[in-house]
Amino acid sequence: MAEVNVRNFNINFGPQHPAAHGVLRMVLELDGEVVERVDPHIGLLHRGTEKLMETKTYLQAVPYLDRLDYVAPMNQEHAFVLAIEKLLGVEVPKRGQLIRVLFSEIGRILNHLLNVTTQAMDVGALTPPLWGFEQRERLMIFYERACGARLHANYFRPGGVHQDLPESLIEDIGHFIDPFLISLSRLDALVTPNRIFKQRNVDIGVISIDEAWVRGFSGVMIRGAGVPWDLRKSQPYECYDEMEFDIPVGKNSDCYDRYLIRMEEMRQSARIMRQCVDRLLGSEKNGPVSSLNRKVVPPKRSEMKSSMEALIHHFKLYTEGFHTPPGEVYVAVEAPKGEFGVYLISDGTNKPYRVKLRAPGFAHLQAMDFLTRGHMLADATAILGSIDIVFGEVDR
């Protein structure tokens, strides 16, 4: 019988594909239906964020952070304002810290709800996204009530937060937690034991601990490999060291483990939210939400009506902005997708000399070739869904 040479063929996945989670183009080299090589092409959403931030004052640069991982915008702001505060040596009052932690955890739930439900949709389940978006809508309303915006918040500011929360909002967030946990249990019962969901995710996209470290994994991706690495515990910032919560870790390092970790992290986030709400309504009911250093934080309207000095401070802060001492600083936070870092170099002026943003999704996407090789074409969407990428932060 004559020998037949079968040549591998290339296909384009995206950038219009709904499972590409944004404007990702992947060139897949296939042997039949088995993936031999994956070549991700990025840059289709590049907007030059880092360079734009270097042309703005520190206060004007904050909104750019919302447009990176736009699924959980406040978590990105958090890293940037912490970096500025580290340069300035500014302390945030306890009530301000609690509000920041509360909204960071709301952001984590917003992110994980979207991810686990769209991951289920990527493998054929159409009900979970409808349930997930119902809960996300409630959380988005909390965002809106806190700062007036559903998505691009611009709420975290150097020195604290833009404004205090009304007591009714804090109470409503507290009332949200128990119904949310019931809804999460329903989602868990629907998806987790599902035979088809398991077949599509178990033993797919496996990576060892050593490979995960080498590739710069963080967040859910490294915890899925069995490493209890969470910056909220290992390098606590704000008041996370005062919070009680557990770090879920996986043992098989596959897509299914990563899904399970995200489900458990939502429960832990709800636990942290409850602690924040209790303290904001109890021991920390009153007090400032921002630093009282008027060289960094603008004065209140009431002060400006009676004090010329306050009016001058306000004018200077919104025109020229504050100056930071020369130096460099790196601050990382445990964002929902992994370690989001901001490397800031100051030359003593009112603008950053250099801003480098460390996006976790960028490192995770690079491993797409390693994770997918040898799997079927259909598994590529499951793996892509489990690594949780958003192109706002990958392309910056």
Curated annotation (Swiss-Prot):
State the annotated membrane topology for this chain.
Answer: Peripheral membrane protein
Main EC class the enzyme belongs to: translocase
Q: Which GO terms describe its molecular function?
A: NAD binding; NADH:ubiquinone reductase (non-electrogenic) activity; quinone binding
Q: Which Pfam families match?
A: Complex1_49kDa (PF00346)
Q: Which domain of life is it from?
A: Bacteria
Instruction: Write the record's keywords in alphabetical order, separated by commas.
Output: Cell inner membrane, Cell membrane, Membrane, NAD, Quinone, Translocase, Transport, Ubiquinone
**Which InterPro entries does the annotation name?**
NADH_Q_OxRdtase_suD, NADH_UbQ_OxRdtase_49kDa_CS, NDH1_su_D/H, NiFe-Hase_large
Q: EC annotation? A: 7.1.1.-
What GO cellular component entries does it have?
Answer: plasma membrane
Location in the cell: Cell inner membrane
Enzymatic reactions: a quinone + NADH + 5 H(+)(in) = a quinol + NAD(+) + 4 H(+)(out)
**For this UniProt entry, which residues form the secretion signal?**
none
Q: Which family does it belong to?
A: Belongs to the complex I 49 kDa subunit family.
PANTHER family the UniProt entry points to: NADH DEHYDROGENASE [UBIQUINONE] IRON-SULFUR PROTEIN 2, MITOCHONDRIAL, NADH-UBIQUINONE OXIDOREDUCTASE 49 KDA SUBUNIT
Outline what the protein does.
NDH-1 shuttles electrons from NADH, via FMN and iron-sulfur (Fe-S) centers, to quinones in the respiratory chain. The immediate electron acceptor for the enzyme in this species is believed to be ubiquinone. Couples the redox reaction to proton translocation (for every two electrons transferred, four hydrogen ions are translocated across the cytoplasmic membrane), and thus conserves the redox energy in a proton gradient.
Instruction: State the oligomer form and interacting partners.
Output: NDH-1 is composed of 14 different subunits. Subunits NuoB, C, D, E, F, and G constitute the peripheral sector of the complex.
User: How is this protein named in the record?
Assistant: NADH-quinone oxidoreductase subunit D
**Organismal lineage:** Bacteria, Pseudomonadati, Pseudomonadota, Alphaproteobacteria, Hyphomicrobiales
Gene, per the UniProt record = nuoD
